[in-house]
Amino acid sequence: VDIAIAFFPTLAFRKNLIMEHIKNYIDQHKDRFLNELLDLLKIPSVSADSAYAADVMKTAEFVKDKLIAAGADKVEVCPTAGYPIVYGEKIISPNLPTVLVYGHYDVQPATPLELWDTPPFEPTIRKTAIHPEGAIFARGSCDDKGQMYMHVKAFELMMQTNTLACNVKFMIEGEEEVGSSNLGIFVKANKERLKADVVLISDTSILANDLPSIDCGLRGLSYVEVEVTGPNRDLHSGV
């Protein structure tokens, strides 16, 4: 009992030190984190419109550079038949579990522009009744650049504070908003490289702004062609 009493305060003290270290890093770098995200949101990476092809490619390079800066290894802009997939990893031990982070850097078209209070690719921070503490208004701020970049910065924080407790892999695509037609091909071709114990998807919903949520599954896409044959004469609706 005496040993236990002496031991647990040591663990608690160490935990408090780690949390203080993490908090200090966030406080020191949160302005940079925000400015980087705003720069990312300024790039009109609209995958559905070929007029923005250069911007989509520019965004892939942006993500690559930030993964490298965060501490990821083997970072690569992997070509596909469409827009590339950005891959990076940090393997700290083959004996530890591996988390594969998925996200996408492309965005939906911002039309009709007249419905926007501010330009979609000029991010602004505003307080509203729904967001009394302020929120970023821009195309992609919550689908999916905001969430995707949050994971990159969380990874950076864990690297810089020596608190990364598992292996991490990133797979960030540029065609989610147009059906991810090349994602399955990439996954099959790289199944060994992408092996993981769990996949963390940064593109889901929350139940409320003040209620973080974990989604355990998502609907997929289904393309069907339906042929309907009807009667050759008028029928009562109940027949």
Model-identified regions with their sequence ranges:
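Acidic-enriched catalytic cores of C-N bond-cleaving enzymes acting on peptides and small amides
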Residues: 207, 216, 223, 237-239
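Short small-residue beta-strand/loop micro-motif enriched in glycine and branched aliphatics
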Residues: 132-137, 232-238
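Short, Lys/Arg-enriched N-terminal segments with co-localized hydrophobic residues
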Residues: 4-18
